[in-house]
Every structure is written in structure tokens, then in C-alpha cells.
């Protein structure tokens, strides 16, 4: 069974980049009838906050990306300890004693010589006595995973195609800090094995991590004496950039809370992000099944995916315009019925704007100043107004015949007097909602304005 996971760290709110990753993992699983799991990567006890765990769950629920299961790394520490000891027994992890300052100095020296900043494995050259001396001085070791330099790392990436890394050009990653806490690499691999993850879909900034983790998977399988297992399939999607094509701090701060405050529908955000970075056009598709049916990793491109806020707003507007009254009635101001919704709907960019447009019906409105000629015209309109199945059509037809007005001269003063605006909902739908008595009063009020 296809099983994917979304593994955020609860050190902040989800932003648009990892929302997209969560969505694509959900889509990959659901397209194939599989499972989408949530893993909370909370091994960093100092930075992880419970409030962010709740926020992550709430954001996924708002987006309709309900996980089929959840794990928390903070509750699985014994599994990482067991894996660590197994790798240690197999000679695949080793202690290192350099301080952060010493490592940074080595890095600067390598860069100054035009060399890649790869860890030099100095710790492997220490004798038992030298290690004992460091620990006697109170220097606790951190631990690195020892890459096998004799075996090239290869995999078929579902987005990037064939990948090949020379492990000698990679640093042995630190997997455990001197205080005993875990870094990302080992817990992630252990969890992927235990959770039965079949596909890892993540950003291209993880490509080198994948190269390391493939060897880690192999080492863990060997330690478990399970040579039949193989690592998950990997897919690395292009990073999200602003519409100018640059990485943007703003994208890193754009989260579900910001989108909700702006009135963006979850369906719009899903429709936008589902196809962003693929060869398929972004369209206002609210039907998840349509998006799932067309989801295909082979359409994912290598170029950075450009997130355009204006495009999201266009998608949102189109989706709002297609929403049924039943979908939104609980979110509308009191008094708006199906007829009211359909009257104002074409003018909405967000559902939240419904209240503003509904005030054209409930009032009060602010009328502009009219010329003497228009005031006389509106006085005639107040007398002419007759209530039938189509009061707007009847009124404008009679006024056209009696005054000879047409076009803007016929319609605009009426709209301004009845709504206080130069544009807005279809008056044929709006006028019956205003009602005969109120409509006549507004026309008469405009006609009774004192001349300037």
C-alpha cells in the first residue's frame, strides 16, 4: 500500500511551502488508495511547542488533509536508541569531539583553499587513549554516521530522474548531539522504516540528505538482518519562489492563518498548490477527485515553482462564484437567503465580503449628489415604480419610453439612488431584495435632495 508522510517540526506555523508538500503527499497517497501519515518531528525539546502541534493539526483539518495516523518522535526515543546501538555495534557510527568553533575553522580553511567543506574524519584517527583523554577533560562526544565511501549512492528520483552521489564528497552527518539529543537524519530513517513509508516526497533542498539516508536505510536493514527490505521511493519537488523567481522571506511567513484572514477558501489554496510547479494549468477546481485523477509526479518540473498571490486571488474568486448557497449559508450575515446570495455572489472576491454587499439591501446607504435633471428623473422613477415579477425591468422600460434616456443615463442614476454605488450586483436581482417600500423611499430621498 502506498504510504506517505508529512513530517513538520512544531517550531512554528506551517507556511505555504510545507503546506504544498503536505498536500502533494496527501494526493500521492489518496490517488493510489493509500495512507497519509502525520509525523511530528519534535526531538528538539527546546524549540518545539505544543501550540504549534495543535496549529499544524488545525491547518491540515482546514485544508481537508486529514491524516490516517499520527506519530510523535518524542514518544519514540527508545526506537532511536536501539537503532543507534545497532549501528554502533556494526561500526557505522563514531564519536567526534570537535567543538562548533573548531568545525567552523576547518570549514573556513577548506573554503579558503577552494575545497568543498567536507568533514575530514579527524575523529576516526584518534586513538583510544586520545578519546579517553578528551572525555577525562569533560568533552562529551557528538556522534556521526560513517558513510561507506566504496559504494556510489544512486536512486531513481520520481521528479529529478536518475541521481548519483559520490559518498566521499559528503560529510559524515552528525546524528546525535553531545547532550544525547537527536538530529534529523537517524530518527527520520527509523520512523520511515517503522511506519512503512513507501514514498518520501519533499523539497529538493533534501536531495543530499536523501543520499545519506539511503546508506542509512541500508545499514539499518543490515543491522536488522533484513536484506530483503529496500528504502522508500524518493521524489524531490522544486522549491517555491515568489513570482519574481526569487526565494522570498514573505513566502516563509505565509501560513493558513494569513490565508484565512484574507478570506482565501481552502479549496482555492488546494487548487493552486496542487498543480503549482507542474506542467498542468492551475485552474479553479474545487472537486478534490478531479485534482487526484490528474495528479502525476511525471508532470512535476525541475524549475522553481512560482507562487503568485494575484493568481491565488483569481482562483479564489472563481471558486467563490461557483459556491452553492448550502455551502456558505452558515457563514453569511443574518438575513441573506439563497436569493440574496445569488444576487451578490458575482461581485464577491471572498465570502467575507458578503456583509458589505448585503448592506446595499439593508442600508443605510450614502447617496451621491445628483444634478437637477437627475433629481427630476428620480422623482419620476419613484412615481413610476411598480411592483411585479420584474420590477427593475418594468421600471427601466417605462422610464426609457417616457424620458428617452438610454444606456448609462438611464441606469446609473437609478443604481446610485438605490445602492449609493456606481457598480454592483445585478439590479434585476437586487431590487426585489430591497423591497418596494424601501426602494421608493430611496428614489424619493434622492429626488428630494436640495440643489447645490
UniProtKB/Swiss-Prot annotation:
InterPro entries (UniProt xref): aa-tRNA-synth_I_cd-bd, aa-tRNA-synth_I_codon-bd_sub2, aa-tRNA-synth_I_CS, aa_tRNA-synth_I_cd-bd_sf, Glu-tRNA-ligase_bac/mito, Glu/Gln-tRNA-synth, Glu/Gln-tRNA-synth_Ib_cat-dom, GluQ/Sye
GO biological process, one term: glutamyl-tRNA aminoacylation
Principal subcellular localization: cytoplasm
Entry's Gene Ontology cellular component terms: cytoplasm
PROSITE patterns registered for this protein in UniProt: AA_TRNA_LIGASE_I
Classification via Pfam families: Anticodon_2, tRNA-synt_1c
Record carries keyword Transmembrane: no
Short sequence motif 'KMSKS' region: positions: 246-250
Catalytically driven reaction(s): tRNA(Glu) + L-glutamate + ATP = L-glutamyl-tRNA(Glu) + AMP + diphosphate
The protein's Enzyme Commission number: 6.1.1.17
UniProt entry tagged with the keyword Secreted: no
Stated name of the protein: Glutamate--tRNA ligase 2
PANTHER family, sorted: GLUTAMATE--TRNA LIGASE, GLUTAMATE--TRNA LIGASE, MITOCHONDRIAL-RELATED
Span of the annotated motif 'HIGH' region: 8-18
SUPFAM superfamilies, per the entry: An anticodon-binding domain of class I aminoacyl-tRNA synthetases (SSF48163), Nucleotidylyl transferase (SSF52374)
Localisation per UniProt entry: Cytoplasm
Binding site for ATP: 249
